[in-house]
């Protein structure tokens, strides 16, 4: 059984942190901050084994849609062409696009220099659980704790050998 830990941090402008960069790191992916033009690359993070975005009921529908033009552009990309599983690559692209859109919309809304843009929660998972048990437990926990209370949740499971955690 892993040693339990649960850490909560605030991601805000005042500390110079980038919510886009934090999400890219969390998801082991590439994301662009539309406000600054900065692109965050974390595609070499191999410990990301599962990622999800759970939207609350009142989240705008357009945050959940990926424009057809963006899909066509991705399907022409080297990243898509080199993918062993094209369907999985397309789903990952759509999910990353939705997350990037969510956080860029937060940045457009929260302009204050001391704005709290999001909260980061990290907790351990029992290493004895199967991947599916980890996903099921985490999904249920996040749904009840955050999404049902009107929050969106951008989360992933990281597997660092004998340390498995949700961030």
Name each region found by the language model.
Residues 1-167:
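N-terminal nicking endonuclease/strand-transfer module with a His-rich metal-binding environment
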């Amino acid at each position: 059984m892993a040693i339990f830990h649960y850490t909560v941090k605030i991601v805000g402008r005042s500390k110079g942190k980038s919510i886009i960069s934090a999400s890219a790191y969390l998801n082991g992916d590439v994301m662009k901050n539309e406000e600054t033009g900065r692109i965050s690359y974390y595609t070499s993070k191999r410990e990301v084994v599962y990622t999800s975005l759970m939207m609350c009921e009142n989240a705008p529908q357009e945050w959940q849609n990926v424009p057809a033009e963006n899909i066509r552009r991705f399907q022409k990309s080297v990243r898509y062409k080199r993918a062993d599983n094209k369907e999985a690559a397309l789903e990952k692209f759509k999910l990353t696009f939705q997350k990037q859109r969510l956080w860029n919309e937060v940045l457009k809304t929260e302009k204050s220099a001391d704005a709290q843009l999001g909260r980061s929660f990290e907790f351990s998972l029992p290493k004895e659980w199967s991947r599916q048990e980890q996903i099921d437990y985490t999904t249920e926990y996040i749904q009840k704790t955050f999404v049902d209370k009107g929050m969106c949740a951008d989360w992933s499971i990281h597997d660092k050998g004998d340390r498995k955690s949700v961030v």
